[in-house]
Amino acid sequence: MDDNGLDTLGQTIVGALPGIATGHSVGFGQLTLTVDAGKIVEVMRLLRDDPRFRFISFIDMTAVDYPGRAERFEIVYHLLSPKLNERVRVKAEVGETTLVPSIIEVFPGADWFEREAYDLYGIVITGHPDMRRLLTDYGFDGHPLRKDFPLTGFVEVRYDDDQKRVIYEPVRLNQEFRKFDFLSPWEGADYPVLPGDEKAGVKS
């Protein structure tokens, strides 16, 4: 399907979801829908069951953190329609306290993806039967894919051979931060003269 066909498909889907789908776009040969996060179950059910669309295959779900936005996160779903031989991306903006309904009643395969979104971003999925952390430890502090999460984390976890158990300790940086000067006099004349480069002004 070319871009015009995808645009027509997007208009048809948006028209079938009045007040729920707020827009669509086509880029790089793929259709993207923007929807209301609170109505995501209705969106998924229509995309799966409507004979015009039949997006019956759930591919994945993820999120993106945009700290500068009022609605900080963008939750993203990808579906595939074997009937149309097309994919669709479904996006919804959510805030830190927005409750997003689980879609596992429509696509059971979304189970662990929803747990991952909670674990790594802190997005709360309601109606999920087992909303526990998935990739981090039970006592983990914070959500590591948020852009304000420190690169070093808050604690380090290691196995202590003396105590014969895993222990948690404050992060220790064994080497102080160093700033390196990567400028080189051999990279070309546009570079500034480095201190101690006595031959900088000599031309052969």
From Swiss-Prot:
**Could you tell me what this protein does?**
NDH-1 shuttles electrons from NADH, via FMN and iron-sulfur (Fe-S) centers, to quinones in the respiratory chain. The immediate electron acceptor for the enzyme in this species is believed to be ubiquinone. Couples the redox reaction to proton translocation (for every two electrons transferred, four hydrogen ions are translocated across the cytoplasmic membrane), and thus conserves the redox energy in a proton gradient.
Q: Which PROSITE patterns match?
A: COMPLEX1_30K
Gene symbol here is nuoC
Q: Which reaction equation describes what this protein catalyses?
A: a quinone + NADH + 5 H(+)(in) = a quinol + NAD(+) + 4 H(+)(out)
Enzyme class, UniProt record, top EC level? translocase
| PANTHER family assigned | NADH DEHYDROGENASE [UBIQUINONE] IRON-SULFUR PROTEIN 3, MITOCHONDRIAL (PTHR10884:SF14), NADH DEHYDROGENASE UBIQUINONE IRON-SULFUR PROTEIN 3 (PTHR10884)
Family the UniProt entry places it in = Belongs to the complex I 30 kDa subunit family.
* InterPro entries associated with the record: NADH_DH_suC, NADH_quin_OxRdtase_su_C/D-like, NADH_UbQ_OxRdtase_30kDa_su, NADH_UbQ_OxRdtase_CS
Keyword terms of this UniProt record: Cell inner membrane, Cell membrane, Membrane, NAD, Quinone, Translocase, Transport, Ubiquinone
Task: Report which superkingdom the organism of origin falls in.
Answer: Bacteria
Q: What is its main location?
A: membrane
Q: Name one GO molecular function term.
A: NADH:ubiquinone reductase (non-electrogenic) activity
What is this protein's name? NADH-quinone oxidoreductase subunit C
SUBUNIT field: NDH-1 is composed of 14 different subunits. Subunits NuoB, C, D, E, F, and G constitute the peripheral sector of the complex.
Q: Hey, what's the signal peptide range on this chain?
A: none
Report the locations given in the UniProt record.
Cell inner membrane
- Enzyme Commission identifier(s): 7.1.1.-
Its placement in the membrane is given as:
Peripheral membrane protein
Query: Which NCBIfam families does its entry note?
Result: NuoC_fam, PRK06074.1-5
Q: Where are the transmembrane segments?
A: none
**Record-level GO cellular component terms:** plasma membrane
